[in-house]
Design a protein with these regions (language model features):
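N-terminal accessory alpha/beta regions
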Residues: 53-74
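Active-site neighborhood of HAD-like aspartate-dependent phosphohydrolases
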Residues: 6-53
Length: 591
C-alpha cells in the first residue's frame, strides 16, 4: 500500500488538475457486485422480486434512452409500480452502506494540500445532489468541479465526458491526471486523449491477488456477498493501513470474526425474545464471543465470562470413566493428597473412586459448594442464559444449573442430542447431514480462548493445566492474534452489519476448509486440538503428516487422523480409499 501511495503522490505533483472516479475508487460498497445492493434491499425489506426487477429496469431504460446515460428517475419509470416507492430506499441504502476508501482519501487530501485543482468525474445514475451529499459526509469535500454523466449526458465510457472536462477546465491533456479503477473508462478512454492515468484495481481484485482461492468463491446469498465484500473493505482500509499482515490476525478477521458476528446476532435475537437479565459466556468457547457481543450490542445485557470446565462437571456429578479418573480424583482430593496416596495412573484412580464411593460423593458435594460460591461472586443476576458452542452432555449448563439450583437458558451453535434442557441451537437440530461444517474441530479452534485448558476453579481462580505441550503454547500465541483480527473486523463493521445466517457461515467456513492454500497448510502444521475432557491427547488440526506411505504402513492410525483433521484434496482421496477399505473389511469380518 505504501509503495503505491508514494508513487501516486509523485505522479500527483506533476499535474495541475487531479480527477477522481467515485465508485470503487473514492467510495466502496461492502458487496461483491454493485447490483448486490438491490439484493440486500429485497432481503432486508422482504420485497420479493425487487433485485431482478431493478436490474431489468436499468437495462430497459438504457435500451430506450437516446442519451449516453440515464437517471435514477428514468430507471424507476421502467420498474413495476409496486417498487416505485423504493427509489428513496435505494438512495438511503447507498448512503448507509458506502465506505470511504482510506487510501484514496489520503491521495485526495494530498492533492488538495499541494494546491492541485481536484475534480470528480463519474459515470453514475444517482442524482448529483445525492452524490455531493455522500462525498462530503465521507470526507471528500472541497473539490473544484463535479462532472457527472447523468447530469451532463456524456460518459467516460465514450470518452466524451473527458473531452467536456478538458474544455470546461480550460486545460490541455498534459495538465490532467485521472485516477480510477475501470480499465476501459478510467484507463483506455482518457489515455486515448493523451490524459495521464493512475489505474488502481478494485479492492476485490486486490484481495484476490493476496488470497487467490477467493477467485473461485461464488456467493449464493446477499449475506455471503457482504462477507467477502466487507472483508475486501476491511483488508483495504484496516489491515493494509495498519500493516497487520500476520497470518493469524487475517484468519481472525476472515474466519473467526465472521463466525462470531453471525452467532452473536443469533444470540441477541433469541435472548431478546426471552426475559433474560444476564448473559453468561462459558470458558473457553465464550472468550471471543463475549468480546464480539459487547462490541455489537454494548450495554444491552449484563455479560459475564464464567469457567465451567467439562472435567469439573464430571467430578461434581461423579461421571467417572477410567481414562479420566486421575484428573477427576485430583479435583476431588487435591493434587497433593493424590500424590500422598501414590495414585499415579487412571486405573489406580478408577479403582480408588469406586472403592471409596461415599467418601468421593462427599468430596463432590464439597466441590459443588466451592463452585457455587465462585458463581455467586460473579453477581449473576436474574434470569440467566449461557453461551457455548456445541454440546453432547450439556456439561456447562448442567453444572451451572446444579450450582445455582435454578434453570438457565442455553444458546449453542449446535446440539449433538436433545436432552431435557431449555436451550436453542443456531444450527437447527434436524439439519440434514450434508448441510454441516466439514470439520467441527476447526470451528472449535476459531471460537476458543488463548488460555490453557482449565481443570478446576479454586477460590474464584481458574486452575489451568500445568504440563501443557509446546503445540498448546503455540496455539495460545496464535489465538491472541486471531482475537485481534476478529475484534478489529467486528469493530469496523458494527454499524453496518447485515444478518448472517447459519448456512451463510457454513458455506463460508467450508470453503476455507475445502480449499486450503499452501500458506494455510504451512501455518497449521503446529496447530493441534485436544478432543477429550482431560486435554491430554492432541491431534493435528491439519493432517500435514498423513501421506500415501503412512496410509500403507499405518492405515488404521492414518484413517483416524484423516477423519478428524482438515484434509487437502489429495488427502481427501486417500481418506475415501481408506473408508472404502474399512467398509469392505467390516463386511468381510461379519461373514
Amino acid at each position: 500500500m505504501h509503495k503505491f501511495l508514494d508513487g501516486a503522490k509523485s505522479e500527483i505533483l506533476k499535474y495541475d488538475v487531479i480527477s477522481f472516479d467515485i465508485f470503487d475508487t473514492l467510495l466502496l460498497r461492502p458487496f461483491i457486485k454493485p447490483t448486490d445492493l438491490f439484493w440486500y434491499i429485497e432481503t432486508k425489506y422482504n420485497i420479493k422480486g425487487f433485485h431482478q426487477a431493478r436490474i431489468l429496469a436499468e437495462m430497459q431504460s438504457r435500451k430506450l434512452s437516446k442519451e449516453q446515460d440515464i437517471t435514477l428517475d428514468e430507471i424507476y419509470h421502467q420498474i413495476p409500480k409496486e417498487f416505485h416507492s423504493y427509489k428513496e430506499v435505494e438512495i438511503a441504502t447507498e448512503k448507509e452502506m458506502l465506505v470511504p476508501n482510506l487510501e484514496m482519501l489520503e491521495l485526495y487530501r494530498f492533492a488538495k494540500e499541494n494546491n492541485k485543482r481536484v475534480i470528480i468525474v463519474s459515470d453514475m445514475y444517482l442524482p448529483l445532489e445525492v452524490l455531493e451529499d455522500i462525498l462530503i459526509s465521507k470526507g471528500f469535500g472541497g473539490y473544484t468541479n463535479f462532472y457527472l454523466s447523468n447530469h451532463i449526458m456524456l460518459t467516460k465510457h465514450s470518452k466524451d465526458l473527458f473531452k467536456h472536462v478538458l474544455k470546461q477546465e480550460n486545460i490541455t491533456h498534459t495538465q490532467m491526471l485521472h485516477i480510477g479503477d475501470n480499465s476501459w473508462a478510467d484507463g483506455t478512454m482518457p489515455k486515448s486523449l493523451g490524459i495521464a492515468t493512475l489505474f488502481r484495481k478494485s479492492v476485490l481484485k486486490q484481495l484476490e491477488e493476496v488470497f487467490p482461492k477467493y477467485k473461485t468463491f461464488t456467493p449464493t446469498s446477499v449475506a455471503q456477498s457482504f462477507i467477502l465484500g466487507s472483508l475486501c473493505v476491511f483488508y483495504k482500509n484496516y489491515i493494509q493501513k495498519h500493516e497487520k499482515f500476520d497470518y493469524w490476525f487475517l484468519l481472525g478477521a476472515m474466519q473467526a470474526g465472521i463466525v462470531a458476528v453471525a452467532y452473536c446476532q443469533f444470540i441477541y435475537k433469541e435472548i431478546h425474545k426471552r426475559n433474560i437479565d444476564t448473559l453468561v459466556f462459558v470458558a473457553r468457547d465464550g472468550y471471543l464471543l463475549q468480546k464480539i457481543f459487547n462490541i455489537l450490542y454494548p450495554n444491552s445485557y449484563k455479560t459475564a465470562y464464567v469457567y465451567a470446565p467439562r472435567i469439573l462437571k464430571k467430578a461434581v456429578f461423579l461421571e467417572v470413566v477410567e481414562s479420566e479418573s486421575l484428573e477427576i480424583l485430583r479435583i476431588l482430593e487435591g493434587e497433593e493428597e493424590v500424590k500422598k496416596k501414590q495414585i499415579t495412573t487412571n486405573q489406580q484412580a478408577y479403582v480408588y473412586l469406586y472403592s471409596n464411593f461415599e467418601h468421593c460423593r462427599h468430596l463432590a458435594l464439597k466441590c459443588l459448594d466451592n463452585y457455587r460460591r465462585y458463581l455467586y461472586s460473579q453477581n449473576l443476576e436474574g434470569n440467566i442464559a449461557i453461551v457455548d458452542t456445541i454440546t453432547l452432555g450439556y456439561s456447562s449448563q448442567g453444572l451451572i444449573q446444579k450450582a445455582l439450583n435454578k434453570e438457565v437458558f442455553g444458546c449453542y451453535v449446535d446440539l449433538l442430542r436433545i436432552l431435557n434442557y431449555n436451550c436453542v441451537s443456531f444450527l437447527p437440530f434436524s439439519h440434514p447431514k450434508p448441510i454441516y461444517f466439514h470439520n467441527w474441530d476447526f470451528m472449535e479452534f476459531l471460537l476458543t480462548s488463548p488460555e490453557y485448558p482449565i481443570l478446576n476453579v479454586e477460590n474464584g481462580v481458574p486452575i489451568y493445566q500445568k504440563d501443557v505441550s509446546s503445540c498448546e503454547k503455540y496455539r495460545s500465541k496464535a489465538y491472541e492474534k486471531i482475537v485481534e483480527g476478529a475484534v478489529g473486523y467486528a469493530s469496523y463493521f458494527k454499524e453496518s452489519q447485515i444478518s448472517l445466517g447459519i448456512y451463510d457461515v457454513i458455506e463460508w467456513v467450508n470453503f476455507f476448509i475445502d480449499n486450503p492454500s499452501i500458506q494455510d497448510q504451512e501455518q497449521f502444521k503446529q496447530i493441534y486440538f485436544l478432543p477429550d475432557a482431560t486435554h491430554k491427547n492432541a491431534l493435528p488440526l491439519f493432517c500435514n503428516d498423513v501421506s500415501l506411505l503412512s496410509c500403507i504402513l499405518k492405515p488404521s492410525q492414518s484413517y483416524g487422523i484423516l477423519k478428524r483433521s482438515l484434509r487437502t484434496n489429495k488427502q481427501e482421496r486417500l481418506f475415501k480409499i481408506l473408508s472404502l477399505i474399512k467398509k469392505i473389511y467390516g463386511k468381510l469380518k461379519k461373514k
